[in-house]
């Protein structure tokens, strides 16, 4: 790395720290990209830190293709665990484990931008190994699917049977469709709407 490249890296650091400080001050968290353990650890740490700093509301912006369900579970549970009220703002797409995180907030605090798309579906997993291990993993995926369907039914007000039928395959919803379905309370177009 030459001196010019090193200077560019050094110049980026204060902006990064300043941006993070501003996000902390504004009590905003961004969940962008795949859901994994690293993201879950970061988001849960941010939630605990913000809760320790104040009881003021927190905003989480979600734009995710989904990912690891258990990582999504940890964020979902932490949102419910902390004292401050959490608002979810969907943007881009809110899919799979991203939707699991999104519904951690009560319906009245679930918002989205107009072009947000939502995807609900059953969990998937790759299995290999001995037949008995594959059987165990299949049972666990079925239990996970039943649990996730129950969470979605409670969050949306839809009957469990409808959720199970809809999530049997990929179930896409526009912002307006998600509002009608009970995923979203309001579609917002500016920060002033929040």
Curated annotation (Swiss-Prot):
Mind telling me which Gene3D superfamilies this protein's record contains? 2-enoyl-CoA Hydratase, Chain A, domain 1
Q: Which CDD domains match?
A: S14_ClpP_2 (cd07017)
Q: Which InterPro entries does this entry report, sorted A to Z?
A: ClpP, ClpP/crotonase-like_dom_sf, ClpP/TepA, ClpP_His_AS
GO BP field: protein quality control for misfolded or incompletely synthesized proteins
Name this protein carries in UniProt = ATP-dependent Clp protease proteolytic subunit 3
Tell me which UniProt keywords the record has, alphabetically. Cytoplasm, Hydrolase, Protease, Serine protease
- Source species of the chain: Rhizobium etli (strain ATCC 51251 / DSM 11541 / JCM 21823 / NBRC 15573 / CFN 42)
Q: One GO cellular component term, please give it.
A: endopeptidase Clp complex
Q: What Pfam families does the database record attribute to this sequence?
A: CLP_protease
| Reactions it catalyzes | Hydrolysis of proteins to small peptides in the presence of ATP and magnesium. alpha-casein is the usual test substrate. In the absence of ATP, only oligopeptides shorter than five residues are hydrolyzed (such as succinyl-Leu-Tyr-|-NHMec, and Leu-Tyr-Leu-|-Tyr-Trp, in which cleavage of the -Tyr-|-Leu- and -Tyr-|-Trp bonds also occurs)
Query: What residues sit in the active site?
Result: 96 (nucleophile), 121
Task: Report the record's disulfide bonds.
Answer: none
Location in the cell = Cytoplasm
